[in-house]
């Protein structure tokens, strides 16, 4: 079987790509015009809508098995404001709930910042999904556990409608793991262009497809080594009752919620070997706006995760500061591979996230 899927906040359909053979996308909701163009080209049989706040079932009155939503994380992520659900964009979770209540799909799959594992955020998301009839289980993990060269740290939640008995999934396509060990493109390009900046932004907004598959299949089967199996058998996860900590740092990193109680479970993680990237300061220009300049070599275990905002600053900072050493364009510029005056490559950013050029099509066809 394959789930007929509505993907909200779709971007370049990274969740659908990660769940290829498990999910069949029939409709997308995405506000970014560049992403809309890609979706209409890549998924010509699917419908594309542009505003999640106005979208209703009357716009697409067909049966849906699954809704997926990587709703904006600006209010939660370390790179964002960390204002939680008070942030306008992160508050769009209310539209996820509204649309879920309209369609009543068998499954809802959510993706967001690892900050969602804090119980004050779980109290909003998980308890609301429970209230509307969904049993939630979730996992928090970094992209380096599936081989990526960065550590995108995300929270994934599988919400199953309480009256639905999950069925065995026979994966309908031969999906294979992304190869981060070969065919790495150059990390910089000579010139700044609209096409390159667009791909940097789209990669930064996107998910890591293999990380999506790892989380979904692990939560569905109870086996976190099942990502590339051709048959996925529903399974259970057994945890222990979570003992709440005092203060705001209480977390349930991997867990589920049942009968008004949080449970946590453990799982084995093996991360890829560190890259140990050397980042060194260079000659300091007379004019710069940098504060807290770095005056020594820094060793970064992994590359920083691509971020959408880098699309407007692909050259990076002209001096190395402690803060800018955590921004990918500057990190690349001052690494052993970087050249001052060149620009962060969108094709390389997409490679870091785990998208092959065949999938991206025209998005990578620029100089």
Swiss-Prot record:
The active site is at residue 73. This is Type II methyltransferase M.CviJI. Belongs to the class I-like SAM-binding methyltransferase superfamily. C5-methyltransferase family. Keywords: DNA-binding, Methyltransferase, Restriction system, S-adenosyl-L-methionine, Transferase. Its EC number is 2.1.1.37. One of its GO terms (molecular function) is DNA (cytosine-5-)-methyltransferase activity. Gene3D superfamilies: Vaccinia Virus protein VP39. One of its GO terms (biological process) is DNA restriction-modification system. Pfam families: DNA_methylase. Disulfide bonds: none annotated. The gene is CVIJIM. Residues 3-367 form the SAM-dependent MTase C5-type domain. It catalyses: a 2'-deoxycytidine in DNA + S-adenosyl-L-methionine = a 5-methyl-2'-deoxycytidine in DNA + S-adenosyl-L-homocysteine + H(+). It is an enzyme of class 2 (transferase). InterPro entries: C5-MTase (IPR050750), C5_DNA_meth_AS (IPR018117), C5_MeTfrase (IPR001525), SAM-dependent_MTases_sf (IPR029063).
């Amino acid at each position: 079987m394959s789930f007929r899927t509505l993907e909200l906040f779709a971007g370049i359909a990274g969740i659908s790509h990660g769940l290829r053979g498990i999910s069949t996308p029939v409709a997308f909701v995405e506000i970014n015009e560049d992403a809309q163009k890609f979706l209409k080209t890549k998924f010509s049989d699917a419908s594309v809508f542009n505003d999640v706040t106005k979208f209703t079932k009357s716009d697409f009155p067909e049966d849906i098995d699954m809704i997926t939503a990587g709703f904006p994380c600006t209010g939660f992520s370390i790179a964002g404001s960390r204002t939680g659900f008070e942030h306008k964009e992160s508050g769009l979770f209310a539209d996820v709930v509204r649309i879920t209540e309209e369609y009543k799909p068998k499954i809802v799959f959510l993706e967001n910042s690892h900050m969602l594992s804090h119980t004050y955020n779980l109290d909003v998301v998980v308890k609301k999904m429970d209230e509307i009839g969904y049993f939630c289980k979730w996992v928090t993990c970094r992209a380096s556990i599936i081989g990526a060269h960065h550590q995108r740290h995300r929270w994934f939640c599988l919400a199953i409608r309480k009256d639905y008995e999950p069925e065995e999934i026979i994966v309908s396509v031969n999906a294979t793991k992304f190869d981060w060990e070969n065919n790495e493109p150059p990390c910089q390009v000579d010139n700044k262009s609209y096409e390159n900046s667009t791909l940097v932004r789209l990669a930064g907004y996107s998910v890591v497809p293999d990380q999506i598959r790892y989380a979904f299949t692990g939560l569905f089967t109870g086996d976190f080594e099942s990502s590339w199996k051709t048959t996925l058998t529903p399974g259970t996860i057994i945890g222990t009752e979570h003992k709440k900590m005092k203060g705001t740092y209480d977390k349930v990193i991997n867990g589920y919620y049942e009968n008004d109680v949080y449970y946590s479970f453990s799982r084995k993680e093996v991360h890829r070997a560190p890259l140990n990237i050397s980042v060194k300061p260079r000659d300091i220009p007379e004019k710069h706006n940098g504060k807290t300049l770095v005056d020594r070599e820094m060793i970064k275990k992994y590359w920083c995760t691509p971020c959408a905002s880098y699309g407007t600053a692909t050259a990076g900072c002209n001096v190395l500061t402690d803060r800018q050493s955590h921004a990918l364009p500057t990190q690349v510029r001052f690494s052993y591979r970087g050249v001052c005056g060149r620009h962060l490559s969108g094709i390389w950013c997409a490679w870091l996230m785990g998208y092959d050029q065949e999938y991206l099509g025209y998005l990578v066809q620029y100089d």
